[in-house]
A protein has these predicted regions:
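Active-site hotspot residues in diverse enzymes, especially metal/ion-binding acidic/histidine motifs
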Residues: 1-159
């Protein structure tokens, strides 16, 4: 992901607490919410990208919705002409560009750094499990985000 896109996401999603799925989607004025299975491919209809959100939010469904939004950001201009049956949710989840964008959506850099700093001990280490709980994401995603931010150190003993 390029720095310009990261900055845009950071500015639009800036917050000191993790946003819920509805709040995240509402930050994108050309997206509308559908209720259903979060492992769904987003589609374009009537001038809007349709993102599917489950009734109950979990860390895993937050990741799934972030991947849908990432797919729209990465490939949105092509969605209107595509046959949606050619793309599966697995394709989206395996796309490296979508992965980077999804991490930035779930954990904007400033929120990530502030949360990590709040949890850090005197040596600058923090528990990845607690970080994941605070950010409402699976542990593996919290650790993956740290790889893109040079000033973050994670104590991985518990992973």
């Amino acid at each position: 992901m390029n720095n310009h896109l990261e900055l845009i996401l950071e500015n639009s999603l800036s917050t000191d607490v993790p946003l819920n799925l509805t709040e995240i989607i509402n930050k994108f004025d050309d997206a509308v919410i559908e209720t259903g299975d979060s492992e769904t491919v987003p589609y374009y209809k009537d001038g809007h990208y349709h993102i599917t959100v489950p009734k109950n939010e979990t860390p895993e469904t937050r990741v799934n919705v972030a991947f849908q939004l990432a797919y729209v950001i990465e490939y949105g201009k092509y969605l209107a002409g595509e046959n949606p049956s050619k793309v599966t949710f697995a394709n989206i989840a395996c796309d490296p560009g979508c992965f980077e964008i999804a991490l930035a959506i779930l954990m904007p850099k400033q929120l990530y750094l502030e949360t990590a700093q709040k949890l850090a001990n005197d040596e600058g280490l923090f528990d990845a499990t607690k970080l994941a709980e605070e950010l409402q994401v699976p542990i593996s995603y919290a650790i993956a985000r740290s790889k893109n931010i040079s000033s973050v150190t994670i104590n991985r003993k518990d992973f």
